[in-house]
Design a protein with these regions (language model features):
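Long, intrinsically disordered low-complexity tandem-repeat segments
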Residues: 270-333
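A glycine-rich dinucleotide-binding beta-alpha-beta segment and adjacent secondary-structure elements
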Residues: 401-455
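Aromatic-enriched alpha-helical interface/lid elements that frame and gate functional surfaces
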Residues: 256-271, 277, 327-402, 406, ...
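Conserved Rossmann-fold dehydrogenase catalytic segment
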Residues: 144, 172-181, 203-226, 243-252, ...
Length: 506
């Protein structure tokens, strides 16, 4: 497996010199900051104080899902390349520290509920007055304005409001969520785009009146980031009154493009030797994977006058029924599927030839997508009959030879064993402080001259508190006093003149 040595501080990234304050927690804000840090930004993560040895305080994500040595392994992905400053933002002394850090920062990222920053006396407009070049990224469920601004918002709720949840289901069944936090991640990536745009504007706005350029506030709403990816949903409704409904594994309006069951069954075991496996045991104290808290109550009510699920743009495209030629599966086993995208006109003909149905490929009524959509059930059934007689590997080999886009539905075991993932550096091996090795996703995107790099492992809570505060001019005695009063944490007895405790500016 390809590995990325960790850490490697000698290579400067494209964002080297960019100073970022991250005041977020959980996913959206921290993911945005992590993306900037991967490409060289100097990121200080501010999180609630506590006792790192006892596992108290800090970003709640430190305790999410499976834990190793008391800390989530997800933490090693979400907080790599960052520094940790443990600070109680409710305290006036902590708020003053944030103002001092903001005065020397380029970017501040926060994802609290609207009004929280203002309640701490840290309103973005006031911070920008102190530092006119400061860029503030604000991520929230519903945005900083509008009638819903004060509602609490998780990514899962944003996915529902943004239109995604309605589409992720089998026709006529309960909508299901995507298996990861797409709403948060999409908002984070939109936020990163906003930061880069604001940096470009700051550079372009340099003038005698603004010698360092002008900063600004970026307002990202989780639901809007989801809605921005909803393709033609709104114009179809505007032009035709069409409400797209769930289509299961099919791609609505495109044929054929679906998941088809094969002869073999799905396994969670690696497909080949050399896959990435955990070298250390998972904490038994962690219990089952810790799920994200679900919104209270049942289904979200629709506004009065909203269009019901019965409205539809044409006939629903059903997922193909199990084919007659498949072998019976063992009780509790899961069938293995392949995704086949034969929706190009010439691709469709090659696909039909490969599955032994050249008659469908030669049918003039199926020569284009519009005709195929009308008969999608017939086409899916023909493909499903063929895939059910073969294993996934046989199907993929045949379609690859025919030039038909297709792929297996990967489990993480498949990913960990896949040579393409390995060749692209997407299976990074991180050496932990205890000497163990942890596999984490590599960095994207891939830049030819200035690629991202894993420079630092994720910090322990307050690991950099002393050094950061020394950089602001505080003495070791003053810093210890802040810790004694519960305002900061992470300060350990050390020689103040040592490299690890000597101050460094933001």
């Amino acid at each position: 497996m390809t590995s990325m040595p960790t850490p490697q501080p000698q290579r400067a990234g494209p964002l080297s010199g960019l100073k970022v304050l991250e005041m977020g927690q959980l996913i959206a804000g921290p993911f945005a900051a992590k993306t900037l840090a991967d490409f060289g930004a100097h990121v200080i993560k501010i999180e609630p104080p506590g006792d790192a040895d006892l596992g108290t305080g800090g970003d709640p994500l430190r305790k999410w899902r499976l834990l190793k040595d008391g800390t989530s392994v997800w933490w090693q992905v979400q907080s790599r390349n960052k520094r940790s400053l443990a600070l109680d933002l409710r305290r006036a002394e902590a708020q003053d520290i944030v103002r001092q850090l903001s005065a020397g920062a380029d970017v501040l990222i926060e994802n609290f509920r609207p009004g929280a920053m203002e309640g701490w006396g840290l309103a973005p407009d006031d911070l920008i007055k102190l530092n006119p070049r400061l860029i503030v990224l604000r991520i929230s469920g519903y945005g900083q304005t509008g009638p819903y601004r004060d509602r609490p918002g998780f990514g899962v709720v944003a996915e529902a409001m943004g239109g995604l949840r309605h589409l992720t289901a089998e026709p006529g069944h309960v909508p299901v969520r995507v298996g990861v936090s797409m709403g948060d991640t999409l908002a984070a990536l939109h936020g990163v785009i906003g930061v880069l745009l604001a940096l470009q504007h700051r550079h372009a706005s340099v003038s005698p009146e603004a010698p360092q350029g002008r900063g600004q506030v970026i307002d990202v709403a989780l639901y809007e980031a989801v809605f921005n990816c909803m393709e033609s949903l709104l114009p179809e409704y505007s032009a035709f009154g069409a409400v797209r409904n769930a289509a299961g594994s099919a791609l609505p309006g495109i044929a054929p493009s679906n998941a088809y069951r094969c002869r073999d069954t799905l396994t969670s075991e690696p497909r080949a030797a050399g896959s990435v496996r955990a070298a250390a045991s998972v904490d038994s104290s962690a219990g089952p994977p810790q799920a994200r808290p679900a919104p209270s109550g049942g289904s979200e009510p629709r506004a009065a006058g909203s269009v019901g699920a019965a409205a539809s743009a044409g006939p629903p495209q059903a997922r193909p029924a199990p084919s007659g030629g498949s072998e019976p599966r063992a009780a509790g086993s899961v069938g293995a599927y392949v995704l086949i995208a034969g929706n190009g006109d010439s691709i469709f003909k090659r696909l039909m030839k490969e599955i032994g149905r050249p008659d469908l490929g030669a049918d003039p009524a199926l020569a284009d997508n519009a005709g195929r959509v009308v008969r999608v059930g017939e086409i899916d059934h023909a493909i499903g009959q063929w895939t059910a007689q073969h294993t996934v590997e046989q199907v993929l080999a045949a379609l690859d030879g025919a030039g038909v886009p297709a792929g297996r539905i990967y489990t993480v075991a498949d990913i960990a064993a896949d040579p393409h993932y390995q060749a692209r550096g997407m299976l990074d091996q991180v050496q932990m402080d205890d000497g163990s090795v942890l596999a984490v996703p590599g960095i994207v995107p891939k830049l030819s001259l200035t690629p991202g790099l894993h420079r630092r492992n994720a910090p322990t809570l307050g690991q950099d508190t002393h050094k950061i505060l020394r950089g602001l001019g505080l003495t070791s005695e003053q810093i210890q006093g802040l810790q004694d009063n519960g305002i900061v944490s992470g300060v350990r007895a050390a020689n103040p003149a040592s490299p690890e405790t000597e101050g460094a500016p933001l």
